Amino acid sequence: MVLEMLNPMYYKITSMVSEVVPFASIAVLLLTGFLLLLWNYENTSSIPSPGYFLGIGPLISHFRFLWMGIGSACNYYNEMYGEFMRVWIGGEETLIISKSSSVFHVMKHSHYTSRFGSKPGLECIGMYEKGIIFNNDPALWKAVRTYFMKALSGPGLVRMVTVCADSITKHLDKLEEVRNDLGYVDVLTLMRRIMLDTSNNLFLGIPLDEKAIVCKIQGYFDAWQALLLKPEFFFKFSWLYKKHKESVKDLKENMEILIEKKRCSIITAEKLEDCMDFATELILAEKRGELTKENVNQCILEMLIAAPDTLSVTVFFMLFLIAKHPQVEEAIVKEIQTVIGERDIRNDDMQKLKVVENFIYESMRYQPVVDLVMRKALEDDVIDGYPVKKGTNIILNIGRMHRLEFFPKPNEFTLENFAKNVPYRYFQPFGFGPRACAGKYIAMVMMKVTLVILLRRFQVQTPQDRCVEKMQKKNDLSLHPDETSGLLEMIFIPRNSDKSLDH
């Protein structure tokens, strides 16, 4: 009787257990699968990297880029994890590479011609699928690059010598505009005005207010640098980037006015050949329906801001290095006298200025301005044995690479580092391959002409033994001196031409 009473209870218990076990098993299996997924995610690659930690790692790495700046964060991670390592930006895998063979591979292949950055950030500054610098639409990028390459080579390259020399001479003749009460020269402002004037004369040809436009270019660059890697939720709060949005609008509106004047000059020109230049070519392409008006405006804007943004700072660093190394200055001045003498500089002088060229290269190696390159993988690949998936972001830390391999004295500033030919895989200040800097040849001409004209007229010194090594800098999208710290002026001492050129 008792057994019969317990029998139904037995069946109820076994029924309950049979119902609970599947649910418990499913829960355990799901949890195990989730943990295995996380474990596998962290170990899908042998590439050195910080831990994933349930998604906390990617948040920390992205925050570090926003906090330290792109360049400083890259140096930090390469120092911590090696010359080929992985982090996350915006939740996307990002490789930071400073190994020459890997850098060479990425630059060489066409499936790395795309760049990466925040879509709303690029839209805000007008670079999303427009212009050339961060245009990631392959078809549009190729279309506009043709116009840039044409303007930056051939006749434009030949004309640059005279145009740049005239601009430098004009600005040196009115040096008092950039001198302070102590007689010190604001070299950054001087160089920015020279580079803007030269670019305008060669590529747009419309009179502009140099002082005002240079300030607006700096505001635009600050916005570009600040917004490039910001996460999407940042742009949901317009007050967070109101200042940058206004800076972008300010420059674009001023550029639109200048470009509209250019359109009018084309219409009223008696001969179209008389006003043919970069801007005219783009405007005619717009009329043919090949480019949109917005893209044309962005291309012209980018052409005009490129030199004031980078070359001006590059020459600024060069002059500080010359001031610290008088033996280098002596060698440069001696070569100027030997090659050019008292006559005007000519295009055929460019290839003969070997000391000047080596000085430029060593300056760009030792104290770079653009020390990183941002790319995105457009297809699966393998780099130096590491698998790279399509869509992976890549930052080439070329500034660090230039101090790691090949050079006999990598941590010193010395022309000995270029006494012998340097294989281009070890030195890439302008990049190479399908997305190399379109203006690398014309940039070399501008720097050579600037140094020759300036050093023929002035000896440069720094107050109180200031130097680039002690200078406060910001290493973000590019490496710039911290202009809020001051102490960036130089002393220009007029040369006695007879004595200086026989120096």
UniProtKB/Swiss-Prot annotation:
The keyword Heme applies. Its cofactor is heme. One of its GO terms (biological process) is response to estradiol. GO terms for molecular function: aromatase activity; heme binding; iron ion binding. It is found in: Membrane. It catalyses: testosterone + 3 reduced [NADPH--hemoprotein reductase] + 3 O2 = 17beta-estradiol + formate + 3 oxidized [NADPH--hemoprotein reductase] + 4 H2O + 4 H(+); androst-4-ene-3,17-dione + 3 reduced [NADPH--hemoprotein reductase] + 3 O2 = estrone + formate + 3 oxidized [NADPH--hemoprotein reductase] + 4 H2O + 4 H(+). It comes from the Eukaryota. Heme binds at C437. GO terms for cellular component: endoplasmic reticulum; membrane. Its EC number is 1.14.14.14. It is a peripheral membrane protein. Keywords: Heme, Iron, Membrane, Metal-binding, Monooxygenase, Oxidoreductase. PROSITE patterns: CYTOCHROME_P450. SUPFAM superfamilies: Cytochrome P450 (SSF48264). Catalyzes the formation of aromatic C18 estrogens from C19 androgens. Belongs to the cytochrome P450 family. This is Aromatase 2.
